[in-house]
């Protein structure tokens, strides 16, 4: 939709896999919530439409003006996004399978100081404060450490894959559309450590069935029932995003290039003697930050912390309806929709030490589960007739 609908702004909240897209219709409506109302197959859903498999979507319509959105009341104050999923069609049963596999890379690195530039600017700072230079000319000339922390944390060629299986068909009596989708994305920061990943499994069944249809009768001559039912299971892990200080990317940009990723063997032994919970990878101790770096720590050590948490989400959205032809042009429709969601978090951690302001002193474990449900029932008549054509 981005760039295709006037007056609609769509931005991604972060580069995290499956990060929400912010949709703004007619600008920002309120301070706390400017999200539009999402309607999927006639059912208002909470939490956006990230749960949907994009290949299951047949059409998306945006209601921007107050008149067209008036039927939804105050809920439509920020606009309405109408989503219609695919339905079956008459004809032979068709089975299709689609597969895609690709790679992702950071499109740009932040320009930061290398080791030589860093020592030079630090000396200038010391001199401007009336102090002696921190690094001598020999230190600058003989320095052998020049760590590019962005290269150390970026997960280059992070894979993303998608599988889609669908079955479509029908006859004069019924139509059906069935789909099974799987999507997996590895994040470009922390994805190779299992810390920034997204996995979605989706199942959909849309069907209609004509209970009866009598062509030679003008009243009560047809009844149609239908079911649109979708289930989605999401699993995701994430790193801290949009944070200047203390996060993995924040440290990768601001941390000193003079600090090596791993401490020397002698220094590593000294670190473990003072801090037994320091991070060790492949038998090597990851460097600790020098004094004065406050919350900034070795970003590679952050990726190797003995902690891990996963967000879980399970969502079922269904619409059940029946439609009766009463008279020519006059129909009655009754529908019931439900949005049932379960979401939670499971995580654990062990004691660790990354710096004076970043450490965990005790093991912990956490598990939570939430449930939310909304339902809607609609009963209405519609009349469609053309006069004096």
Task: Please identify what each model-predicted range represents.
Residues 330:
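An active-site-proximal structural segment forming one wall of the substrate-binding cleft
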Residues 1-205, 209-225, 317-318:
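Short, small/polar-rich motifs associated with maturation and membrane association
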Residues 90-146, 190-198, 202, 208-315, ...:
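Surface-exposed loop/interface segments of Gram-negative outer-membrane beta-barrel transport/assembly proteins
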């Amino acid at each position: 939709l981005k760039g295709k609908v006037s007056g609609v702004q769509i931005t991604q909240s972060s580069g995290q896999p499956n990060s929400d897209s912010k949709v703004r219709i007619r600008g920002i409506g309120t301070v706390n919530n400017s999200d539009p109302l999402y309607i999927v197959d006639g059912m208002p859903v909470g939490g956006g439409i990230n749960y949907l498999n994009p290949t299951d979507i047949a059409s998306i319509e945006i209601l921007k003006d107050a008149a067209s959105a008036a039927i939804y009341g105050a809920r439509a104050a920020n606009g309405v996004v109408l989503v219609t999923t695919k339905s079956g069609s008459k004809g032979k049963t068709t089975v299709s399978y689609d597969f895609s596999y690709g790679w992702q890379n950071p499109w740009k690195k932040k320009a930061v100081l290398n080791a030589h530039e860093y020592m030079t600017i630090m000396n200038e700072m010391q001199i401007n404060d009336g102090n002696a230079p921190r690094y001598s000319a020999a230190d600058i000339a003989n320095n052998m450490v020049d760590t590019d922390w962005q290269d150390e944390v970026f997960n280059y060629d992070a894979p993303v894959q998608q599988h889609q299986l669908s079955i479509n068909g029908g006859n004069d009596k019924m139509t059906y559309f069935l789909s099974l989708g799987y999507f997996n994305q590895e994040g470009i920061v922390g994805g190779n450590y299992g810390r920034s990943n997204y996995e979605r499994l989706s199942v959909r069944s849309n069907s209609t069935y004509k209970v009866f249809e009598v062509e030679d009768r003008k009243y009560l001559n047809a009844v149609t029932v239908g079911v649109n039912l979708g289930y989605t299971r999401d699993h995701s892990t994430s790193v801290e995003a949009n944070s200047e200080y203390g996060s993995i990317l924040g440290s990768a940009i601001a941390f000193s290039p003079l600090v090596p990723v791993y401490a020397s063997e002698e220094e590593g032994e000294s670190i473990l003697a003072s801090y037994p919970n320091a991070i060790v990878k492949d038998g090597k101790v990851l460097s600790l930050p020098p004094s004065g770096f406050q919350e900034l720590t070795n970003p590679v050590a952050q990726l190797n912390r003995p902690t891990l948490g996963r967000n879980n989400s399970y969502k079922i959205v269904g619409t059940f309806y029946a439609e009766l032809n009463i008279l020519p042009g006059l129909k009655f429709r009754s529908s019931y929709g439900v949005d049932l969601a379960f979401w939670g978090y499971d995580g654990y951690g062990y004691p660790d030490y990354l710096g004076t302001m970043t450490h965990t002193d005790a093991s912990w474990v956490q598990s939570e589960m939430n449930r939310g449900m909304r339902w809607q029932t609609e009963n209405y008549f519609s009349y469609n007739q053309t006069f004096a054509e």
